[in-house]
UniProtKB/Swiss-Prot annotation:
Record-listed E.C. numbers: 3.1.-.-
GO cellular component, one term: cytoplasm
HAMAP family reported in the protein's UniProt record: Endoribonucl_YbeY
InterPro entries the record matches: MetalPrtase_cat_dom_sf_prd, YbeY, YbeY_CS
Superkingdom: Bacteria
Record keyword Zinc present: yes
Main function: Single strand-specific metallo-endoribonuclease involved in late-stage 70S ribosome quality control and in maturation of the 3' terminus of the 16S rRNA.
Organism of provenance: Erwinia tasmaniensis (strain DSM 17950 / CFBP 7177 / CIP 109463 / NCPPB 4357 / Et1/99)
Family assignment from sequence similarity: Belongs to the endoribonuclease YbeY family.
GO molecular function terms attached to this record: metalloendopeptidase activity; RNA endonuclease activity; zinc ion binding
Protein name in the entry: Endoribonuclease YbeY
Keywords: Cytoplasm, Endonuclease, Hydrolase, Metal-binding, Nuclease, Ribosome biogenesis, rRNA processing, Zinc
Keyword presence, Metal-binding: yes
Binding site for Zn(2+): 114, 118, 124
Length: 155
């Protein structure tokens, strides 16, 4: 058993059709143990209003977004397995899946993997960083049996 602890918070008005908690756990366990074997992550599933508010407050972007990552930084000298929080907007993820021709499950998995890598310190601001992060995401997605999430961008 992995040392990955998931705290799943459902803050969506409509919870029907969401991935199961076991799916979120499986996606986290595909990423985290190789980097931080003992880790705790909160995943909060939200509606557009909460996503928009958080995106505006923390990124100065007045629109909802697919996933926001909030890494936890323990005070010096204190070691905790708490990695951070992922805030995922249901409507944005599901709309993107349709627009990008992906299954909802694959896109949900990708958003959890993408957000988890952000919690671990990966970023995609610079081209070389983006290439490294996207390569890791693709490797993890393929290992889980999902298609390359960037295939349409590579064609």
């Amino acid at each position: 058993m992995s040392g990955v602890i998931l705290d799943l918070q459902l803050a969506c008005e409509n919870e029907q059709g969401l991935p199961a908690e076991t799916d979120f756990q499986r996606w986290l366990e595909a990423v985290l143990p190789q980097f931080q074997p003992e880790s705790e992550v909160t995943i909060r599933l939200v509606d557009e209003a909460e996503s928009r508010e958080l995106n505006h407050t923390y990124r100065s972007k007045d629109k909802p977004t697919n996933v926001l990552s909030f890494p936890f930084e323990a005070p010096p000298g204190i070691e905790l397995p708490l990695l951070g929080d992922l805030i995922i907007c249901r409507q944005v993820v599901e709309q993107e899946a349709v627009e990008q021709g992906k299954t909802r499950e694959a896109h949900w998995a990708h958003m959890v993997i993408h957000g988890s890598l952000h919690l671990l310190g990966y970023d995609h601001i610079e081209d070389d960083e983006a290439e490294e992060m996207e390569s890791l995401e693709t490797e993890i997605m393929l290992a889980l049996g999902y298609p390359d999430p960037y295939i349409s961008e590579k064609e």
